[in-house]
Amino acid sequence: MARRDIGTDDPRVRVRPGKGSRPRTKVRPAHADAVTGMVTRIDRGHYRIHLDDPSLTEDGGGDITAMKARELGRGKVVVGDQVAVVGDVSGRKDTLARMVRIEPRRTLLLRSAEDGDSAGSQKPVVANADLLVVVTALADPPPRPRMIDRYLVAAYDAGMEPLLVLTKSDLADPTELLSLYQPLGVRCLATTITESGISGIEVVRQALAGKVSVLVGHSGVGKSTLINALVPAANRVTGHVNEVTGR
C-alpha cells in the first residue's frame, strides 16, 4: 500500500501554532482617539489628570481620574507627566478613564532614597517642570547652604532652572547669602511679610508666570505662606516655628 503524504497545505490538516508562529501580543494599539493631559495628583493607583482641552469634561474644568492601562507595565508615572487617556473623560463622579501612554519627558526631578533596601537609588518625583523654586528663610529657621547646594545640583541634573526665594528678609540681611549664589548665575528673590501682605510676592509671581514650578525647602521656611499668596484657593495650612526644634 503506497504511503500518502498529506502536506500542511491540505485543508484537512489543522496545524496548531507554536510559540514562534503565534501573532505578537505585545504590540501596543495606536489609540488614535486618545486625548492628552498632565498628571496633577496620584493616590493609591488613581491618577488625577488635567486635560489639555478642558471642554471635554462635563463641567468644563478639565479634571478627570484615570487608572493606568496594564499595557504600560510597571513604569513609574509621576506628577507632571504628560499622558494620553482613552475611555470616559467626562470627569463625572465615579468615572474612570484609562491611561494608555506616557509622553517623553522634558525634565525629570530625582530624589535619592536615604534608607531601606533602595538606599542610594534615585526616585523620580516630578516630570516636565521648568523651575525648581528653592525656598529658604533668612532666619527662624536659619538658612542651610548645604541643603540649598543639593537642591541646585538636583535642578541642574534634572534640566530645570533654579530660583532661590529668600523669605523673612525683615529678620536678617540677605547680602551674605546672596553673595554665595548670585556669582553662580542663580536668580535670587527676597520676600518679607508686612501688615498689608507679602512684600516682593509680585516679583515672584512674575518669575513663575507661564511655567511649571516645584517648590522645595525644609519645614518652617514659608512654603505654604508663599503658595497661599500665589494661589489663594490652595488654602494651605501654615504654622509657627517651634523654638526648641526649629521646625
Segments (PLM) and residue ranges:
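N-terminal accessory targeting/assembly segments
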Residues: 1-142
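Short flexible coil/turn linkers enriched for glycine and charged/polar residues
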Residues: 33, 41-43, 93, 127-130, ...
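Conserved beta-strand/loop subsegment of P-loop NTPase cores
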Residues: 128-136, 157-169, 185-192
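Histidine-anchored nucleotide/phosphate-binding helix
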Residues: 146-156
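Canonical P-loop GTPase G-domain recognition
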Residues: 168-221
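Walker A/P-loop
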Residues: 219, 224-225, 229
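Switch I (effector-binding) loop of TRAFAC-class P-loop GTPase G-domains
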Residues: 232-247
